[in-house]
Swiss-Prot record:
The protein's name in its UniProt record: Cytochrome c oxidase subunit 2
Annotated organism of origin: Galleria mellonella (Greater wax moth)
Function in brief: Component of the cytochrome c oxidase, the last enzyme in the mitochondrial electron transport chain which drives oxidative phosphorylation. The respiratory chain contains 3 multisubunit complexes succinate dehydrogenase (complex II, CII), ubiquinol-cytochrome c oxidoreductase (cytochrome b-c1 complex, complex III, CIII) and cytochrome c oxidase (complex IV, CIV), that cooperate to transfer electrons derived from NADH and succinate to molecular oxygen, creating an electrochemical gradient over the inner membrane that drives transmembrane transport and the ATP synthase.
Assigned EC number: 7.1.1.9
Gene Ontology MF terms: copper ion binding; cytochrome-c oxidase activity
Family: Belongs to the cytochrome c oxidase subunit 2 family.
Catalytic reactions on record: 4 Fe(II)-[cytochrome c] + O2 + 8 H(+)(in) = 4 Fe(III)-[cytochrome c] + 2 H2O + 4 H(+)(out)
GO terms of biological process kind: ATP synthesis coupled electron transport
Keywords in alphabetical order: Copper, Electron transport, Magnesium, Membrane, Metal-binding, Mitochondrion, Mitochondrion inner membrane, Respiratory chain, Translocase, Transmembrane, Transmembrane helix, Transport
Amino acid sequence: MRTWSNFNLQNSASPLMEQIIFFHDHTLIILIMITILVGYIMINLFFNKFINRFFLVGQMIELIWTVLPAITLIFIALPSLRLLYLLDELNNPLITLKTIGHQWYWSYEYSDFNNIEFDSYMIASNELPLNNFRLLDVDNRIILPMNNQIRILVTATDVIHSWTIPSLGVKVDANPGRLNQTNFFINRPGIFYGQCSEICGANHSFMPIVIESISIKNFINWINNYSY
């Protein structure tokens, strides 16, 4: 999601998103170095008049332009593979949240607790308070505790959706008849916004996601109050 006067990724709210940002910066530096090097060589070749009519085969230079790109790809691939395995690793989740995509809203079930399930609809612009975000706020937010491992089970009832929270580095497809899962760890309190990231029909743009991260003590109080 773009924000006003900002060309960077959103501020991280989870360790995995921090790793994604580090990898993005790492890859971008390598791409900038390659662009500068290739541009410098092309400009030099364009403006000089050196010609070698007898240079037909050069095993050394062929070896160099084969080995150097291979080493560069290794420097990109190794951190990428490490990050891919980290994103799929699941360590003893404290809470499991089931997310169900519908046309065009989300419903949530806290599977570890009784009688905690609700639908989450976007708040219409004419009903939106002045301090809320247009097309991003919902009537029922997801309440989750920070500094705890959270597991998300994602599915859909009609068409393919995608449950996405950029600041947590989470994007999971919601497929009818299939249960996908992911996990994340929220390391600070706050409100984090996301949207459906798979075109799913006429009102695809009106499927926001809002997570409110609170302390474990406040979360237990919320659970107790909601149960009654």
